[in-house]
């Protein structure tokens, strides 16, 4: 099976190796680049819990002054793995869904325990900080990275893709979906995806690509990528 992955290499290198070990052909089309955002200095010692909704949020955070034994809430297993790699020991992970993450926080962190810091990228799909504030929590959102659309792609890669279109393509965000649509249109690939299954996180992401004719569209949570191989 031919699989197209679209995340930055640091977010999908393990998946590339895994899929190749299963005998699949894997192509890599990084649609977005991740860049650190400089932010104001924050005294992290005053927070009693930390929330991460992506691995990138962990990578770009200056951890000086932060007690790594505090409760660390992660949106999914990959983010939790990244957090543990940076020394966090008291981690709690949802199943790749921000709404599930909110419920985990409500169940495992009492608002009387103190302040929460929510570390994220510039663009988010769910305003988790506002939702928690509406529940009475004291939450500070810290934006420490942004996503930038890649605009230059290797012509040799594009020509090879036209000759061997993927059976599956994984898209992880509305930003990525918009970038993929732009890539498809710019390279006049609109009519070539009718035998490709589109795998998206959430309906809002898949909606960005509805004008392209796909074989089927599947919605999934992070961590379910391998399971989806057996659904088509």
Question: For each of these PLM feature ranges, what is it?
Answer:
Residues 1-232:
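Signature of uroporphyrinogen-III synthase
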